[in-house]
């Protein structure tokens, strides 16, 4: 049975700033897939979906009661999550037709911030973000066209994963601007957001914008170059300015290096979304309904859609050409940086202030978001700190199309470094868990254990990452090996040799997986006296790994007592020359 929060009608507006306004409808009992495996990857996790996403048997309202229709089938992404064992508990409020970044543009009521009900929650995926922040669900789906999957995350101390365009099917989603729409994921940890993405992604032949995207599986460098706008705008909000500086310091503590970038062309691209003929796609998405029922659409959404109706085809072509020219201008940025870092939202806005000046205040919230989908980038909003006034602050990590897993790796490190609790629940951050590894599909692969200069962050690690290798885990060898520092090797390398039972030790190794097609060229780079052989891990399994000829050990220092190459290198750095 569907339960609406007013217990009378699905179309009665909820009170402004009422926490119940986060929901448009709840399901009782929750919806589950009876055929889902009990040990599915999302088994038992409770989730909600933004009410512009179809769920069979439920009305889809897009926060416009007159527009509502009964969905005959699940959206592709909903079906995939249910099949993975997740349990659907309701549909959430949004800025009408996903047109806004603030969460107040809904006849069902304004969704308040989870930390202070006087402030906006951010939108348009307002309800989804709030119910994750408050712990009512484990994760939720939103959509993101101009920042709707990121701004609410940043304002509510949760993670907002905005995938590469077409990575998650948008079939069964009411379009906002279909060519750049993305289904987004809200969770309280990066790890869970990545788990949901691993289930949700995949091509869909019934979605014209779905893509079978190759994902970058090599982790970002341990010391990434982070691009930061040379000029920043916080609209007079000193607390947010200080919080962003603190966030950058956290990244630097993780080894990142700041690189100033020119934000002007990105800002110009952002402006195209609403200040050019590109806004016509907003109108086209709901043209038939809007032309017949314009009065049913609330302001300022009505004005935005009407603006889109005024443009002609030639205007749209001009805007697209301008976008491509700006994209060409921006592209060289990626030669100098590994990731772009911006404030998710530059300020917090009260509901009162938003209603007094809805266009300007909404535009301010999107100062660092609107360009991302137009340029086909991936993005991840990560909480980093609480401001001096106790309100949440987060940054968005942005990378090229297909960098989703790379951003998740860095985002997880940054989130854990923050020391924050989860959302508005007060729950402590759990121990870091390994992110799910994106599947290689039908591509044959080889696993190899590395022990020395090929470890993450070491000089030869690039020989793995440039071949598309993925770091699976850090583990230890079986206690059958000894480790030696080989003299005269550049860069310095160890030699690992198998010894008789009782004479060896368990040594730290990393297990990587790479496409088989790249394995031969990797092995060809290994110089004598090193080679590849079979190595036994502490769990008894065997993988390919680095071995060393015993003749090369003459004059080599036995460093087995360090337990691994990284600790040996660290000990040398700590010892005065």
Label each region the model flagged.
Residues 44, 83, 134, 138, ...:
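Glycine-rich, small-residue loops and helix-cap segments
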Residues 33, 162-242, 265, 409-412, ...:
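A short helix-breaking turn/cap at a secondary-structure junction
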Residues 61-68, 460-477:
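Short Gly/aromatic-enriched secondary-structure transition segments
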Residues 42-64, 223-225, 277-331, 383-391:
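Short helix-loop capping/hinge segments that flank enzyme active sites or metal/cofactor-binding pockets
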Residues 40-56, 88-91, 172, 227, ...:
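ATP-grasp fold ATP-binding core
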Residues 74, 79-197, 373-396:
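Short glycine/serine-rich loop segments
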Residues 47, 53-56, 80, 182, ...:
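Gly/Ser-rich, acidic/histidine-flanked active-site/gating loops
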Residues 1-70, 75, 97-100, 244, ...:
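Short, well-ordered alpha-helical
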């Amino acid at each position: 049975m569907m339960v609406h929060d007013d217990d009378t009608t699905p179309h009665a507006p909820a009170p402004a700033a009422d926490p119940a306004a986060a929901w448009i409808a709840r399901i009782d009992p929750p919806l589950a897939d009876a055929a889902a495996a009990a040990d599915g990857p999302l088994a038992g996790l409770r989730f909600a979906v933004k009410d512009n996403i179809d769920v069979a048997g439920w009305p889809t309202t897009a926060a416009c009661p007159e527009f509502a229709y009964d969905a005959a089938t699940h959206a592709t992404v909903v079906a995939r999550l249910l099949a993975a064992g997740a349990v659907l508990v309701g549909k959430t409020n949004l800025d009408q037709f996903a047109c806004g970044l603030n969460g107040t543009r809904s006849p069902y009521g304004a969704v308040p911030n989870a930390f202070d009900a006087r402030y906006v929650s951010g939108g348009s995926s307002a309800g989804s973000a709030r119910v994750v922040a408050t712990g009512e669900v484990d994760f939720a789906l939103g959509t993101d066209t101009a920042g709707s999957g990121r701004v609410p995350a940043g304002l509510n101390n949760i993670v907002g994963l905005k995938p590469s365009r077409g990575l998650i099917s948008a079939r069964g989603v009411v379009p906002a601007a279909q060519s750049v729409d993305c289904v987004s994921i809200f969770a309280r940890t990066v790890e869970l957001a990545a788990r949901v993405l691993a289930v949700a992604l995949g091509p869909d032949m019934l979605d014209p914008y779905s893509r079978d995207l190759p994902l970058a599986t090599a982790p970002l460098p341990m010391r990434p170059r982070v691009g930061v706008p040379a000029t920043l705008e916080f609209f007079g909000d000193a607390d947010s300015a200080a919080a962003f500086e603190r966030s950058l310091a956290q990244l630097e503590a993780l080894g990142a290096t700041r690189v100033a970038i020119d934000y002007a062309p990105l800002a110009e691209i952002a402006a195209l979304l609403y200040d050019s003929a590109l806004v016509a796609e907003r109108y086209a998405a709901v043209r038939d309904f809007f032309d017949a029922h314009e009065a049913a659409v609330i302001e300022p959404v009505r004005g935005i859609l009407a603006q889109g109706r005024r443009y002609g085809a030639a205007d749209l072509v001009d805007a697209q050409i301008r976008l491509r020219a700006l994209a060409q201008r921006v592209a060289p940025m990626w030669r100098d940086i590994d990731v772009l870092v911006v404030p998710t939202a530059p300020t917090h806005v009260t509901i009162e202030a938003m209603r007094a000046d809805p266009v300007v205040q909404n535009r301010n919230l999107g100062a660092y978001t609107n360009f991302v989908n137009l340029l086909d980038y991936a993005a991840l909003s990560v909480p980093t700190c609480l401001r001096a006034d106790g309100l949440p602050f987060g940054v968005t990590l942005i990378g090229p199309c297909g960098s989703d897993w790379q951003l998740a790796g860095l985002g997880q490190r940054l989130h854990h470094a923050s020391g924050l609790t989860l959302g508005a629940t007060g729950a402590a951050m759990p121990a870091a868990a390994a992110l799910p590894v994106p599947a290689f599909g039908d591509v044959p692969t080889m696993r190899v254990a590395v022990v020395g200069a090929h470890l993450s962050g070491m000089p030869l690690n690039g020989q793995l990452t440039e071949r598309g290798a993925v770091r699976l885990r850090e583990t230890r060898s079986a206690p059958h090996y000894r480790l030696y520092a080989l003299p005269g090797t550049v860069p310095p390398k160890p030699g690992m040799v198998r010894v008789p039972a009782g004479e060896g030790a368990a040594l730290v190794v990393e297990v990587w997986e790479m496409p088989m097609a790249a394995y031969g060229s990797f092995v060809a780079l290994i110089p004598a006296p090193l080679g590849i052989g079979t190595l036994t891990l502490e769990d008894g399994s065997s993988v390919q790994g680095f071995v060393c000829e015993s003749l090369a050990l003459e004059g080599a220092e036995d460093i087995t007592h360090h337990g691994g190459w990284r600790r040996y290198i660290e000990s040398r750095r700590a010892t005065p020359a």
